[in-house]
Swiss-Prot record:
Residues 1-25 form the signal peptide. SUPFAM superfamilies: Virus ectodomain. The keyword Coiled coil applies. This is Fusion glycoprotein F0. Keywords: Cleavage on pair of basic residues, Coiled coil, Disulfide bond, Fusion of virus membrane with host cell membrane, Fusion of virus membrane with host membrane, Glycoprotein, Host cell membrane, Host Golgi apparatus, Host membrane, Host-virus interaction, Lipoprotein, Membrane, Palmitate, Signal, Syncytium formation induced by viral infection, Transmembrane, Transmembrane helix, Viral attachment to host cell, Viral attachment to host entry receptor, Viral envelope protein, Viral penetration into host cytoplasm, Virion, Virus entry into host cell. Belongs to the paramyxoviruses fusion glycoprotein family. Disulfide bonds join 37-439, 69-212, 313-343, 322-333, 358-367, 382-393, 416-422.
Length: 574
């Protein structure tokens, strides 16, 4: 009767989980703002990493001194093969230890020699492998930045004299103990695998018998299973240069991880959050190779501490907003650059511009505050009024109207420009909407895909409520003649200031042009006046001359008596 009960309990648990997931997804809402071509997805709860919790994990190893068995039994051969793999793994870990950042000169001088086997050309091989791993580790370390700093600090302490023995002694009679290190830090240490006791007390006594006989295959299988964990841990550390993320089930099994979470100095709500989201915890955790010494392999597991939980979070999606003039090359564009995740945090807002660094599970958002910027709560005003005077909203500008789509939590924003064809489709009904030029939005209700040109986008099928907030596109408020282009990291006030500068320059140019034209007009008037005066003077002179001439012609000629007698005399003298 227990089996049906277990089935019923399992079904009940599954239904409860589905109900919880469905209920939480129902709380997701999304608002699209036509005026700024942006959408805000709300209803999420925070899980912000604010610190790290470090723990030391150990595996006890065996000092295999001698293998007397030379039998031909198939099971014995399998055991010997596993022992060879075991030896190679330990050698690999020894070499890897020399290139980890926690290793110092003292630790290198004390490199353990308790294994009676070597690699071919040990000296040259060690140097070559060590140099290669150093280069690889440095490259990996640049990628994780300061995230593993606390784990490295603990790992370095383990290289000091007596630290490994201190841990080993604490774990003699238990698999878990709190150990105070020499730097004053207390860490929880756990022994997850005891290969020493198994190999020394169970395996080697069998294979070293003169008869070299193994009665059953179970012994081989058991050793393979135990050895496989060490081999996988070695492979992961080797491939990832001593630092791995996420933390695999070989580094920590699920039961070991849950036990470790339960021992963490955090609230019950935080423990519940981490226990219910083990995969996310693994993704945000690190395992760091530390030391192999005194027949002990020790590595550090660094788990996230979620110091801020259950505060509201929202995600901003943005897409280019352009004018839609028919003349090609005459359009201007504006895009909000403040897209990403936002979470309330102690009276301010933690902003995560790289949204992909946050992990979402149902309505829970797991983010690392190391990747965040702290902003005032007024940043929310940008969603409802981008021109608000309390917070200077961030934008970028261009004069290239590229068509694209942004998939949101509950739909898609579509920026469609030029001759690009943009559609929304249902897998059963085909195209159900064709977008006109401009910025638009479609919810995921009845929509499976969005097509922009030759690019196909699949919308999320999360449940929730969408709201379309209409408004005049703010790009229409700007004059293309004075709109600044290619401003990649600007704000509304900076763009407006550049526009005002352009307008002031135009006004100044107009004034200068007006002054030049006015000067030219004055000169023209003076020249015209002079010409007119000269013409008037010339005309006056001509008029006076004509008047005198006419007067002279109209006066009769009178001859005196003497002149007449002279004439007569002359006439008669001939």
């Amino acid at each position: 009767m227990e089996l049906p009960i277990l089935k019923t309990n399992a079904i009940t648990a599954i239904l409860a989980a589905v109900t919880l997931c469905f209920a939480s997804s129902q709380n997701i809402t999304e608002e699209f703002y036509q005026s700024t071509c942006s959408a805000v997805s709300k209803g999420y709860l925070s899980a912000l990493r604010t610190g790290w919790y470090t723990s030391v994990i150990t595996i006890e190893l065996s000092n295999i001194k001698e293998n007397k068995c030379n039998g031909t039994d198939a099971k014995v051969k399998l055991i010997k093969q596993e022992l060879d793999k075991y030896k190679s793994a330990v050698t690999e870990l020894q070499l890897l230890m020399q290139s980890t950042p926690a290793t110092n000169n003292r630790a290198r001088r004390e490199l353990p020699r308790f294994m009676n086997y070597t690699l071919n050309n040990t000296k040259n091989t060690n140097v070559t492998l060590s140099k290669k791993r150093k280069r690889r580790f440095l490259g990996f370390l640049l990628g994780v930045g300061s995230a593993i700093a606390s784990g490295i600090a603990v790992s370095k302490v383990l290289h000091l004299e007596g630290e490994v023995n201190k841990i080993k002694s604490a774990l003699l009679s238990t698999n878990k103990a709190v150990v105070s290190l020499s730097n004053g830090v207390s860490v929880l240490t756990s022994k997850v695998l005891d290969l020493k006791n198994y190999i020394d007390k169970q395996l080697l006594p069998i294979v070293n018998k003169q008869s070299c006989s193994i009665s059953n295959i179970e012994t081989v299988i058991e050793f393979q299973q135990k050895n496989n964990r060490l081999l996988e841990i070695t492979r992961e550390f080797s491939v990832n240069a001593g630092v791995t993320t996420p933390v695999s089930t070989y580094m920590l099994t699920n039961s070991e991880l849950l036990s470790l979470i339960n021992d963490m100095p955090i609230t019950n709500d935080q423990k519940k959050l981490m226990s219910n989201n083990v995969q996310i915890v693994r993704q945000q955790s690190y395992s760091i190779m530390s030391i192999i010494k005194e027949e002990v392999l020790a590595y550090v597991v660094q788990l996230p501490l979620y110091g801020v939980i259950d505060t509201p979070c929202w995600k901003l999606h943005t897409s280019p907003l352009c004018t839609t003039n028919t003349k090609e090359g005459s359009n201007i564009c504006l895009t909000r650059t403040d897209r990403g995740w936002y979470c309330d945090n102690a009276g301010s807002v933690s902003f995560f511009p790289l949204a992909e660094t946050c992990k979402v599970q149902s309505n829970r958002v797991f983010c690392d505050t190391m990747n965040s910027l702290t902003l005032p709560s007024e940043v929310n005003l940008c969603n409802i009024d981008i021109f608000n005077p309390k917070y200077d909203c961030k934008i970028m500008t261009s004069k290239t109207d590229v068509s694209s789509s942004v998939i949101t939590s509950l739909g898609a924003i579509v920026s469609c420009y030029g001759k690009t064809k943009c559609t929304a489709s249902n897998k059963d009904r085909g195209i159900i909407k064709t977008f006109s030029n401009g910025c638009d939005y479609v919810s995921n209700k009845g929509v499976d895909t969005v097509s922009v040109g030759n690019t196909l986008y699949y919308v999320n099928k999360q449940e929730g409520k969408s709201l379309y907030v209409k408004g005049e596109p703010i790009i229409n408020f700007y004059d293309p003649l004075v709109f600044p282009s290619d401003e990649f990291d600007a704000s509304i006030s900076q763009v407006n200031e550049k526009i005002n500068q352009s307008l002031a320059f135009i006004r100044k140019s107009d004034e200068l042009l007006h002054n030049v034209n006015a000067g030219k007009s004055t000169t023209n008037i003076m020249i015209t006046t002079i010409i007119i005066v000269i013409i008037v003077i010339l005309l006056s002179l001509i008029a006076v001359g004509l008047l005198l001439y006419c007067k002279a012609r109209s006066t009769p000629v009178t001859l005196s008596k003497d002149q007449l007698s002279g004439i007569n005399n002359i006439a008669f003298s001939n």
